[in-house]
Amino acid sequence: LPALPEPVPDQAPSSSPAHGRLSLLVLYTDRLEECRAFYSALGLSFAKEKHGDGPEHHAAVLADGTVVELYPVLSAPTGPVRLGLEVDGRRATPPLPPGRHVVTDPDGRKVEVRAHGAQAADTPAGNGGA
């Protein structure tokens, strides 16, 4: 890859939408319900959707407005994808302690999860854990 130019001090990158941000991620799977359960266990809240003649699928809106959709594979599968999520570890099932975790979804995709929130030991008894 070519080297990127160094930012000019008064034009430093910002997190403003004018500089772009991910707004949609679609994962195609032949294990739709398994993937929905997997990502739901990480704290994503999915709604079932159908647009026109398209297939039923699941959609979740992340805290920053990014939409994550799970679609059934209807033709040739798409290429691999690297996925990273930031979640409240207390809402995961089982709860995840703060930090970086790498998990595998039902389609074999490696998912990097950065959990924040209370330590797993700080979660109420009966909510899972090691």
Indicate residue ranges for each PLM-predicted region.
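General helical structural elements
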Residues: 35, 86, 113-114
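A short, polar/proline- and glycine-enriched secondary-structure boundary/capping micro-motif
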Residues: 46-47, 79-82, 122-124
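Short, charged/polar low-complexity linear motifs in solvent-exposed/disordered segments
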Residues: 54, 86, 128-130
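Short strand-connecting beta-turns/loops that link adjacent beta-strands
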Residues: 32, 53, 75-76, 118
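Vicinal oxygen chelate
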Residues: 1-18, 21-30, 49, 58-59, 66, 71, 73-130
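Core segments of cupin and vicinal oxygen chelate
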Residues: 16-20, 26-68
